Each structure stands twice: as structure tokens, then as C-alpha cells.
A protein has these predicted regions:
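Short, well-ordered beta-strand elements within core beta-sheets of diverse protein domains
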Residues: 41-48, 63-69, 155, 266-269, ...
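Hydrophobic face of amphipathic alpha-helices that form TPR/SEL1-like repeat modules
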Residues: 1-38
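Rossmann-like NAD(P) dinucleotide-binding subdomain of oxidoreductase/dehydrogenase enzymes
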Residues: 131-276, 401
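ALDH superfamily catalytic-core signature
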Residues: 240-381, 444
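Structural signal for hydrophobic packing residues in well-ordered secondary-structure cores
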Residues: 64, 68, 83-90, 94, ...
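Glycine-rich loop-to-alpha-helix module at the N-terminal edge of alpha/beta enzyme cores
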Residues: 40-129, 140
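Residue-level signal for inorganic ion chemistry
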Residues: 39, 75, 97, 119, ...
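Conserved C-terminal structural/oligomerization subdomain of aldehyde/semialdehyde dehydrogenase
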Residues: 38-44, 230, 267, 321, ...
Length: 490
């Protein structure tokens, strides 16, 4: 199987095999991974199926009965080893990430810092899985609640944040005593494999962490959802696929964490600090080329400041440098593939047809390939696709509003509820809006919710899914509560 050279200090990180039960396995059947910036072939990766996935699940189940009995302090030490190795190799993994995903190297390094925070956090949380003792109304009885690991877990991760989604899902599971089968996105398997390689080096016993790759995820997904040995699935991706996984998992009653699509509103009130709001929107909207589930998708600006704010924002957008993620000057890389380009074009075409104005951008970039111009649309209305559908690209549509009540209604007029953002200096308004907006996460006077790392819970409501990752709540989805009742205590 072919694999290209990437300038790494630790060349052992670039692996095009899968880890199953402590053994690195290849396959005669492979698929190709390309660099979205250049179109160059990076590697040929094993195209595995049901047989290999079943073997990985069996290995994880066998390992679970040993790993779950390892003292929490020892699991913590192994997680700390993993943390240390990922920190030492973060720059190399960032290069792999940029090569296969496209985002600027500086952004990839930022993602690595975010990914690392979850390993560090849950290495400590492993030692803090506490139960409870409850008073019993009956004399000579005692009641207790224990927390135990849920069992074998599957992590199905996306291409847009291929490092962070591995650690955000696996670190709390490992801390709890769970074992894993990981299925990374077919566009970005090398980043995930590198992290798994370092986990193996850190001392995780064989079978505790397994990874399977495939060009056609349906076969692996069907095995994961139907196999009774899998007790929990954590998935980040589209709402459409999340529904399929949930339906397929119903017969085996699996525990699910689903972080799905978003259509985030970004609101700028007339009392806001406009410069802060512009910078917040720039960071949130064009990070990863808009290819983030929490990316601002609908931008509402109060009518009194609308023209001023749009003008300020367009000035900043024109400063973005589109290019290969490995180029030092690039501040925005390519989209992941042609399908992503076509969706952005469709949303722009629909908006312009219905009366929107292109303030800047609006077409594929002169670099060609998967590159697209950062685009700003004004005079957008709620009848346009970009105001109701997730674009997942570098498109910023501006909508005018009059009152607070009106914009809250606009913000909540969607089936999704992952992230939202607003800027205001009025403390009373801040409380009202924060409580009224229907989303799992709210950024207040900031355009980046997730840059706080593992400290804050991450997850949505409505059709954006359920479950929380990160923070002290993040380990709960990997635990079951067992009630103990003691009698005849004299």
C-alpha cells in the first residue's frame, strides 16, 4: 500500500494500517486519500468491512473485562503517558492533519491543542468517578450507588476535526474503563491512526483501542449498530446520518451520544462593541473555511448598525489569504471536496436569485480545485437557503432585524440547536437572550465557543443531537449507575 512522504520528525506516525487487537493489519482492498489543496495522492488505506469490524469488537470486548478492572489511578497514568506523547508529537500530527484535511497549519496546531486538552482533563477525571451513599428509611439498611463503565464503545468521527473528535470521545471513555472501536472519516484517517499509534506507545493494553477504516462506511456502521457487544456509540456528523445510526441501534438498545448538524445564529445588537463583534465573527465564520458544525450560519445585525457592521466585516474578509494549508501566509485553506464547493455555490445562486447582494467573493477561487472565495452576502432574507440550511463553507449571509424579540424568534426558527452567538454590552439583555435562545451552547461576546478546551460541555438540543462531551459532565455518558441495597446490618 502506497504512502507519501511528509516532513515529520517522528516518521513512525505516518501509518497506513489499522490496529486490531494489538496488531497492525493491512488489506488487499484499499482506498486513496488525497490532499484537498493539491489533489496529490497521500496514501492508500485499508478498505475494511464487516469481518474486520467484528474482530475489532471482539477484541474490545475481551479487553474490556481486563481494562475495566484496572485501578483508576493506573488508567490515569496511561492517559497521562498518552497526553505526554501527543504533546511531544503535536507538530507532526498537525502536519499530517493539514495534508489530508487542508486547514492552515496554524489552525491544525490549534486543533491539536484542543485535542490535547481532553486527554489531560480526563486523565484527572479518571480518579474522580464518585458514587453516593443514600439514607434508607428502613432501620438496619444502607443504600449505595456505584458508577461503572458502560462497556465496549464505538467512536465514529468526522473529517473536519479529525484529531479533536478522537480525543474528545475516547479520553473520557478510557478514563471510565471503556474500550473502543474507532471509525474515522474516510477523508482523514491518517490523523486518527497517528493518535492510535501514540496510544499504543503509551501503554494501552491490546484490544483497548482499535481502529478500522473504510471508503464505504455503511458496512462498518451496520456492524457497529447491530452488534450486541457494542454498548455505546458516539457520533459526530450530519443529522441525517445520526438518525440512521439511531434507528439501526434501536434493536440493541445502545447508549448514544450524537453531535449533529447546526445552523448557528450570530446576533449583533446595536449596543455591541462592533470591533469585537467583527473579530469574533471572522474567527467563528472562516475557521476551517466555515466547515465546522458550530460555524455561524446566519448573521443577524440590528438595523441601526447594519450598514456600518457589514462594511467593517467586508474590509476584514478581504484580508484573508486563501491557499495551501502548508503555506505560511495562508489563513484559509480549501474546502474538503467538490461536493462542498457545489453546496456553497448553490446557496449563493439561490440567494442572489432572490435578491441578495454579493459584497465580496461569490465564486470559486482563482487557485482552482477545492478553493473558494470567502463570500459575504447582504440583503439576505429568511426565505433563502443560506438562512435556513447549514452551508458548511465560507459564506457569511447578513440579515437585518429590528427588535430583540424579533431576532430571538428568527434564531429559534430552525430544527437545529447546537451553537449560537450574540454580542451586546447590556447585562439584562445578555441574560434574557442567553436563556431564550434554543441551543446547547451560547457564545456571548465571543465567536469561538470551543476554544476553552475540555473545560466546557459540548453538545446540542433539538435536531442537533444529545449528550455532552468535555467538562466534568463528559464522562457521564460512559458510565452506568448501579444501585446497591444492604440489609440486616445489626
Amino acid at each position: 500500500m502506497k504512502i507519501s512522504k511528509i516532513a515529520l520528525k517522528n516518521k513512525s506516525l505516518l501509518v497506513n494500517k489499522c490496529l486490531i487487537n494489538g496488531k497492525w493489519v493491512g488489506s488487499k482492498k484499499t482506498f486513496k486519500v488525497h490532499n484537498p489543496s493539491t489533489g496529490d495522492l497521500i496514501a492508500e488505506i485499508p478498505d475494511l468491512g464487516k469481518k474486520e469490524t467484528s474482530a475489532a469488537i471482539d477484541a474490545a470486548e475481551k479487553a474490556f473485562y481486563l481494562w475495566s478492572k484496572v485501578p483508576a489511578i493506573e488508567r490515569s497514568k496511561i492517559l497521562k503517558n498518552w497526553h505526554k506523547l501527543v504533546v511531544e508529537n503535536a507538530d507532526d500530527i498537525a502536519k499530517i492533519l493539514t495534508t489530508e484535511q487542508g486547514k492552515p497549519l496554524s489552525d491544525a496546531k490549534g486543533e491539536m491543542n484542543y485535542a490535547i486538552s481532553f486527554i489531560e482533563w480526563f486523565a484527572e477525571e479518571a480518579k474522580r468517578i464518585y458514587g453516593d451513599i443514600m439514607p434508607d428509611p428502613i432501620k438496619n439498611k444502607r443504600l449505595m450507588a456505584l458508577k461503572q463503565p458502560v462497556g465496549v464503545c464505538a467512536a465514529i468521527t468526522p473529517w473536519n476535526f479529525p484529531a479533536a473528535m478522537i480525543t474528545r470521545k475516547c479520553a473520557p471513555g478510557f478514563a471510565a474503563g471503556c474500550t473502543f472501536v474507532i471509525k474515522p472519516a474516510e477523508q482523514t484517517p491518517l490523523t486518527a491512526i497517528a493518535l492510535v499509534k501514540l496510544a499504543e506507545d503509551a501503554g494501552f493494553p491490546k484490544g483497548v483501542i482499535n481502529i478500522v477504516t473504510s471508503l464505504e462506511p455503511e458496512e462498518i456502521g451496520a456492524e457497529i449498530t447491530s452488534n450486541i457487544k457494542i454498548r455505546k456509540i458516539s457520533f459526530t456528523g450530519s443529522t441525517e446520518v445520526g438518525r440512521i445510526l439511531m434507528k439501526q441501534s434501536a434493536p440493541t438498545l445502545k447508549k448514544l451520544s450524537l453531535e449533529l448538524g447546526g445552523c448557528a445564529p450570530f446576533i449583533v445588537f446595536e449596543d455591541a462593541n462592533l470591533d469585537h463583534a467583527v473579530q469574533g465573527l471572522m474567527l467563528g465564520k472562516f475557521r476551517n473555511g466555515g466547515q465546522a458544525c458550530v460555524s455561524p450560519n446566519r448573521i443577524y445585525v440590528q438595523e441601526k448598525i447594519y450598514n456600518t457592521f457589514v462594511k467593517k466585516f467586508v474590509t476584514e474578509v478581504k484580508k484573508l489569504v486563501v491557499g495551501d494549508g502548508m503555506a505560511a501566509k495562508s489563513t484559509m485553506g480549501p474546502l474538503i471536496d467538490e461536493r462542498a464547493i457545489l453546496k456553497v455555490q448553490d446557496h449563493i445562486k439561490d440567494a442572489v436569485k432572490k435578491g441578495a447582494t454579493v459584497e465580496t467573493g461569490g465564486k470559486p477561487h482563482k487557485l482552482g480545485g477545492n478553493f473558494f472565495e470567502p463570500t459575504v452576502l447582504s440583503n439576505v432574507t429568511k426565505k433563502m437557503k443560506c438562512a435556513s440550511e447549514e452551508t458548511f463553507g465560507p459564506l457569511a449571509p447578513f440579515i437585518k432585524f429590528k427588535t430583540e424579540q424579533e431576532v430571538i424568534a428568527y434564531a429559534n426558527s430552525t430544527d437545529f440547536g447546537l451553537a449560537s452567538y450574540f454580542f451586546s454590552k447590556d447585562i439584562a439583555r445578555i441574560w434574557r437572550v442567553a436563556e431564550a435562545i434554543e441551543s446547547g451552547m451560547v457564545g456571548i461576546n465571543t465567536g469561538l465557543y470551543a476554544n476553552s478546551g475540555a473545560h466546557l460541555p459540548f453538545g446540542g438540543v433539538k435536531q442537533s443531537g444529545f449528550g455532552r462531551e468535555g467538562s466534568r459532565y463528559g464522562i457521564d455518558d460512559y458510565l452506568e449507575i448501579k444501585a446497591l441495597s444492604f440489609g440486616n446490618i445489626e
